[in-house]
Amino acid sequence: ITSIEKKIAELSYYLFISRHKYTQLINEKLQNRSQLITLCQIELDYKNKLFSNQIEKDEFVHLYIQELYKNRDIDLKSNRLNLGVNSININIQMGEDEKIEAKYCSSGEQKSMLISIIFAVATLIKERNNKNHVILLIDEAMAHLDDKHKEKLYEEIRQLNSHAWLTGVSSD
């Protein structure tokens, strides 16, 4: 079981580092967009505080193996890993100076934030894929956006310079 715990710790380290890196990249794209639909930021909140700080791989693996060992009985009783890199809350906040958690925003603001994140990810994919076009399918977005945000959505689509399909049941 010790070798399995070591493998879990090593893979968890790589997942943690990757997740942190791509969250930073998405946040940079969200900050650098000139026509953001809604300005927002993503924060990762791990239940296991070991994942709170970036530390060297060897130290991380060593500390995580110790935690896995201490929690073997709990994990056995619950029939799952309780301290995994998967135990995370993803918090999204709207705004730049006075940030508001997404859970306190209107459903329209939440949808606008989601669209902003989708465009940030699409931009990242396009940049990392030799500028090849991405294909976006945006379903029922117009029904939830006011005129100002609809214009911003159209501008985002133009700036992305890729294929986009907007679907919905209303004529807007």
Residue ranges and their predicted role:
Residues 139-141:
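Walker B catalytic acidic pair
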Residues 167-169:
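H-loop/switch region of ABC-family ATPase nucleotide-binding domains
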Residues 2-135, 144, 148, 152-163, ...:
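Conserved NTPase motor "head" modules and their coupling/switch loops across ABC/AAA+ ATPases, GTPases
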